[in-house]
């Protein structure tokens, strides 16, 4: 039975969606005012893995991940650059899509705030009509005192602890939050019943999630720093409008990505743009590294740790490539020896360990331990030339990779004969003791991603 840690109840719970096998999941996406960084990717990859595991378990997952393309940060950034707010939003939205494609993160729906202004106005008007919101000269605000359950997600019940997002004189209470902001001179605006203006931050997610997932849904995800006030405010306005509790059944939050123990943030100047990481490392290496820690724990970034992840993944890929070669080129022998029978049984046990790990709140470190254990058996199968054990290991790895997506078979059509020729030439050079030229061929092949393994007078090669 799959168990998930629910931030709302602060405990592990059996995962029972509202309308199985359907799972409706909303994840907070980017505010597109600057480059996405590796900390953002930590959240997006984590929930992509969660989605793909749920699908592996037989659930039909609708995954909505929004794009906030109008916000104070975007307006301020446009002023800094001397361009329009839309140019800023479009530039970083396009970059975000390119990065998500590389990381193989594909939500079902990617709604943008500016495409849902009418829906947002309708949501705000409903809250005003029901007495949960009030209109002032500066905008429309949610009356937090009218909602008795405020603080249920974060556990922050003391009003003195409630944050004031911005100082506005005409609010009833300092902790009331904006649903609609009247535009100041030079700011973008849309017509509304109250004033020319734009949506507040929190109302956007409530509106878009309910539009695509309904008045009540299964999973809401995001980074831990969104718990308060963003997710707290989402709950307040959504439960006030729809009259349902809980509005979302399971709240899941990813841990911080840190640098030398400090949270990655602009204020600390330790941001690492995701595009820079992907210039140096394959997307699969980034996915592997991000999933090497449990999604709720902190993960400390360093280039050295990514290099370690690259080396680890390279070793695993080499084994997987060899297993694929054996399964494609060799044939089953029919009769198994004692080791093969035992090994195939071990693979089935390892498969169960993988599912047990992922069923325990998506414990990816333990799931990866199961994959590595299977690949150790795979290496033995390669040494023994066992087609049957190779197949058993490969089938399990392919199954696990539906979640992790790092072992995609790489196509090298037409290059094998040329590599074989170079390896043969190098062997001749070694026989002639032309070590310098032989080493030159090895180094050049290595640069091209081809690893040579000298075994006495014989040489084998693999794609790295």
UniProtKB/Swiss-Prot annotation:
Cofactors named for this entry: Zn(2+)
Catalytic activity as recorded in UniProt: tRNA(Cys) + L-cysteine + ATP = L-cysteinyl-tRNA(Cys) + AMP + diphosphate
GO terms (BP aspect): cysteinyl-tRNA aminoacylation
Keyword Cell cycle: no
Subcellular location field: Cytoplasm
SMART domains: DALR_2
Record bears the keyword Ubl conjugation: no
SUPFAM superfamilies cross-referenced by the UniProt entry: Anticodon-binding domain of a subclass of class I aminoacyl-tRNA synthetases, Nucleotidylyl transferase
Binding-site residues, Zn(2+): 28, 205, 230, 234
Protein name: Cysteine--tRNA ligase
